[in-house]
Structures are given as C-alpha cells and as structure tokens.
C-alpha cells in the first residue's frame, strides 16, 4: 500500500529577481505575426527503457532519491517494481510491476511537471550530478535547494486543510497576477494570452472568495502570481523543460507558473494542440495549494486530457479549493424564481423555472437540478435584463394566478413591469402610460423605498417589507389589508426565541424547488414554515421562521469575480 503523502505543491521561488524595464519589448504587439520566423520546436526524449522509467518515477515522486552508497537511479526503500506498481494502480493499469507497453505509454503522456506524490522524509543526502540531470534539474543546483523544492516546509502563509496534501498558499483574498513582459509565448499573441489567463483566474474566482486582479505596473516583487513561457533552461528556474511532448508546465512555491514554449499551446477556439486555458487552470490550482489527483473529471489530474472544450471545475475540485479558502458569502439585493412556459414535442405546455440571485450590478442563475450556479456566472444585469435598473434592485414580484401573470421589479420609489415574452421591460401599460411608475400609484398604501417583497400564491397576497413592518397587499382589490401594516415578528414569528431577522430584510422569495418561502439577511437565511411542515408538526406556528442557517450551506458558489472579467 502506498505509504506516501501527496506532495505539497508550493515549491520555492525561482524567478530571477532583476530590474525589469517599464515597457519591455514583447514578441507581438498589434502587428501580424506571419512575417516572423519561429525557431523550430525541441522534441522531448521519449521514455523508452528502464533508465528513463527510473528517472521518471524519481522526478514525479513515485520513488525515493538514492543515497551516494546506492547506484544512481535505484529507489531507496521501495524496489522499482513497487514504484511501477503504484504508478500503474494510480493510472488504472494492471498493477503487475512490469514496465510494459501500456505503462510506458502512460509515462509518455503530456503532463504537468509538478510531482504527484511525496514519499516518507529522509535525511538530506547529496545527490549525484548525473541524477539531477536525469530529473530535469541543472547539475549545479544544490542538494539542499532540490530537497526544499520537492519537500517544502510549511510557512506562515500555509495551513494544512486535510491529509490529502492540499495546503493554503495565500492568507489574503485579493491576489494580483502578471504575465511577465519578456516571457510571452511565441505561439499566441500577447492579447490572446492575457485574455486566456484572465479567464483561467476567473474560473477559480467563480467558486472561491478569491479576487484575482491583473497588475501590470507594480514592482515584480509585489505581484503575487507571475506567469511566463520559456524553453529548456528558462526564467532562472532550476528545472529544465524537456521539449514538446511531455512536461508542458510547472508551478512553483509563492506564485510562479512556467509554460514550456516548445509545446503547441492553442487558443480557446481551437480543438487541436494543448489548450492553454486548461493548462493554466490546472497550474493555478497548484499555486493556490491543490495537489495532483487521479480522480476522473478533475482538472488537477497530472496528465493532459485532450478533446474537452467545455471543461469546468467539477464538484470535488470546488470542494477541495473551498476547504482551503472557504466558501463565498455575501448579501443579496433580491432572489427569485423565474417562471416560464415551454411546449414539449407533443405540444403540451410545461412550466419551468430558474432561480436568480441579484447583487449590486451582477446576477447569477442557479441551477437547482445541479445545485450550483451556472458556469460562467455572474453576468451584468445590463446585459441580461433589458430596461430595468442596472444595479441595486430592491425587489421582484411575480403575481401568478388563474387570471394574472405579471412580473414587477422595484427600486427606490418606482416599479417596472417586465415582458417575459420579449425579454424586456414594458415601456408603457395598456392605457399608454409609461413605465417606470411610482409605487404609490400602482400599489396604493405601500411605502418606498422597499426592503423586499414576495407574492404568496396561497393567499394571493403580496407581502411588502419595510424596516420592521410588513404590508399585506390584496392583488385582486388592489389595496393593503385593513389590519396591516404589522410587525414582521408578529406575522412571521420565530420558532426559537430571538432567532429572527426582525427588520431590514435583504430578500424574500418563494422557492419552487423547495416549495418553501425563504428570508435572507446578510449571510443567513430563515425558512418559513410551509403547509407540509405544519402537517408534519401541528405545533409549529403559522408562517413561523425556522432558526437561521448560512446561505452558503444551501446555495453554493454564488461568488463575485473581478470587474475586469465580468463580460468574458
């Protein structure tokens, strides 16, 4: 059984600290690059024999570094067969321990240069220069530094998250990055590279509270994550790239990512070569503290898997990074289910719905079936909802009954009616009067601005919330009920004393996915006692509020991203 723990992927800083020109010359500017004569790509030497396989197993952590008393290339503590067997098992090959053709083929797959595993620690021993060369390291690299690269000690910025080898690499939530000016790729234009990297960082930001910002002006020592391309001996790094076909990139401790420019990196629109986006997302995962995993579907698999254009971070990758940096939190301006009618292949009308979360000028679509936000969200309200205010909406109400199907957005002292058929706000009503209208005109007796509102289909009432008061509005009579307004705590009493929002709700909505009403305030939510809850426990108060819970434990990955990446 493998007695090794996964290698911590936070390796020592290796970028040469040298003055950089304020505007370094780049390979590409805005000109066409067809006149350039690119240098021929170097090809990696394939792993073909026992010696190559030994070097591979050492380089990627499957066997231990030999001492001077042992012949170079012979693992310590584990035989070669044991190391091969462990590698085969991880790669879902028959664990024979024999260096057969399928095993050699697995070793020759394009892969990340970060080691896969870490064996039990041993005393620091000098390593023969020949072995360093076979591992892709410069012979002059000192053994102490080599061991630090493979087995880094925890520092003040790191904290173990679990026994999987993952460790938190940064203690702050806002991180800067830069594509180093003299280390652009010869494969793509500078604008393409930076766009791809912005998207790669955004994909991690969509599932964590981390905020990634490109910084092209600060001193290099102040930038958290630096990216660059090189060939062979590159960027002052002790690791030497092997040419096209095997190691395509590696990540280093304290925020460095190097890409082998001998590889055929391709842009988003290409279905050939190696996707720079996919490699970048993988290496950023290392810089943030995630190790390799051989789990199918993970972006952190060590080998490159081609022909996967629509890849995303899967559930386990999301949970792994959130164990290090936490889940996303934050209040919402409004939350609602958007109801739509569709006809199936038989012409039958089916009612569908999606949940939307609005915050500031952004919105997220929540896929209840998958229990996560839609890939690529958030988006700007401006681009998805035509004609309504572009930020800080107070409430959404869908009056839906046998005789009505009306949708309203509220902000300040005004409201807008939305046309779901044409996907835009109405500009005027049936009498030719223009929208937006004053809340006091369309909903007499309702104050403004509102905190929030929702429509209760059971009673055909709109509940409007203002500070500690609630107003029940009869949509059929177009008036507030005589006994209202009332205290929110009176209409929606707490089941547990003092466990109540009391005033200033952020949002309230009826969820068709959960058949329940929810109140939101800050990072918490309260579930309103439903008819089903009352049937199961008759002692529960009518419209009572169950104790609050964290929003992030029920609705996952509603995360902000940096404004520079909103329209990607």
Swiss-Prot record:
First-level EC class:
hydrolase
Q: Which Pfam families match?
A: Hemopexin, Peptidase_M10, PG_binding_1
Q: Which organism is it from?
A: Mus musculus (Mouse)
**Where found, per UniProt?**
Secreted
Q: What is the effect of changing residue 177 to L?
A: Miri mutant, animals exhibit visceral heterotaxy, with heart defects commonly associated with heterotaxy
Q: What is its main location?
A: secreted
State the family named in the UniProt similarity comment for this chain: Belongs to the peptidase M10A family.
Q: List the disulfide bonds.
A: 328-559
Q: What is this protein called?
A: Matrix metalloproteinase-21
Positions binding Zn(2+) in this chain are 112, 282, 286, 292
Q: Which PANTHER family match?
A: MATRIX METALLOPROTEINASE, MATRIX METALLOPROTEINASE-21
Q: Where is the active site?
A: 283
What does the protein in this record do? Plays a specialized role in the generation of left-right asymmetry during embryogenesis. May act as a negative regulator of the NOTCH-signaling pathway. Cleaves alpha-1-antitrypsin.
- Where does the signal sequence lie? 1-24
Gene expressing this chain = Mmp21
């Amino acid at each position: 059984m493998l007695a090794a723990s996964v290698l911590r992927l936070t390796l020592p800083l290796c970028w040469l600290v040298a003055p950089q020109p304020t505007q370094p010359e780049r390979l590409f500017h805005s000109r066409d690059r067809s006149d350039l004569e690119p240098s021929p790509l170097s090809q990696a030497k394939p792993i073909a024999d026992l010696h190559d396989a030994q070097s591979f197993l050492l380089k990627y952590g499957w066997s231990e570094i030999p001492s001077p008393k042992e012949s170079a290339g012979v693992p310590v503590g584990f035989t070669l067969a044991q190391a091969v067997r462990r590698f085969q098992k991880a790669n879902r090959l028959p664990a024979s321990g024999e260096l057969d053709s399928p095993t050699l083929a697995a070793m020759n797959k394009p892969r990340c240069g970060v080691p896969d595993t870490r064996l039990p620690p041993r005393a620091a021993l000098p390593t023969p220069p020949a072995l360093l060369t076979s591992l892709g390291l410069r012979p002059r690299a000192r053994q102490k530094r080599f061991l630090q690269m493979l087995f880094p000690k925890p520092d003040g910025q790191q904290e173990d998250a679990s026994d999987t080898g993952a460790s938190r690499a940064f203690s702050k939530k806002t991180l800067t990055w830069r594509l180093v000016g003299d280390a652009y790729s010869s494969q793509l234009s500078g604008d393409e590279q930076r766009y791809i990297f912005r998207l790669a960082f955004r994909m991690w930001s969509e599932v964590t509270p981390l905020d990634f910002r490109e910084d092209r002006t600060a001193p290099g020592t102040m930038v958290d994550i630096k990216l660059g391309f090189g060939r062979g001996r590159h960027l002052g790094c002790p690791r030497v790239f092997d040419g096209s076909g095997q190691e395509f990139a590696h990540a280093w401790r304290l925020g460095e990512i190097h890409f082998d420019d001998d590889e055929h990196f391709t842009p988003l629109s290409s279905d050939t070569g190696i996707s720079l986006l996919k490699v970048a997302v993988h290496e950023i995962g290392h810089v943030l503290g995630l190790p390799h995993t051989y789990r199918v579907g993970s972006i952190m698999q060590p080998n490159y898997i081609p022909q996967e254009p629509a890849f995303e971070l899967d559930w386990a990758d999301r949970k792994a990074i959130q164990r290090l940096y936490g889940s996303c939190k934050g209040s919402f301006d409004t939350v609602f289910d958007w109801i739509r009618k569709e006809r199936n292949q038989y012409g039958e009308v089916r009612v569908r719905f999606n949940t939307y979360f609005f915050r500031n000028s952004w919105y997220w679509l929540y896929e209840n079936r998958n229990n996560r936000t839609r890939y690529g969200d958030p988006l700007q309200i401006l681009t998805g909802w035509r004609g309504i205010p572009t930020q800080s909406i107070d409430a959404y109400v869908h009056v839906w009954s046998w005789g009505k199907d009306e949708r309203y957005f509220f902000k300040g002292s005004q409201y807008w009616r939305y046309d779901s058929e044409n996907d835009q706000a109405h500009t005027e009503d049936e009498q030719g009067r223009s929208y937006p209208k004053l809340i006091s005109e369309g909903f007499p007796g309702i104050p403004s601005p509102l905190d929030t509102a929702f429509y209760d289909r059971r009673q055909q009432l709109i509940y409007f919330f203002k500070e500690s008061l609630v107003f029940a509005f009869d949509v059929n009579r177009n008036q507030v009920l005589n006994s209202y307004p009332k205290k929110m705590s009176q209409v929606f009493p707490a089941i547990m004393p003092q466990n109540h929002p009391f005033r200033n709700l952020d949002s309230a909505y009826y969820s068709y996915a959960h058949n329940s009403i929810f109140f939101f305030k800050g990072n918490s939510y309260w579930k309103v006692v439903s008819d089903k809850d009352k049937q199961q426990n008759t002692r529960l108060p009518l419209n009572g509020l169950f104790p609050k819970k964290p929003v992030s434990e029920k609705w996952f990955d509603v995360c902000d991203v940096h404004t520079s990446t909103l329209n990607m």
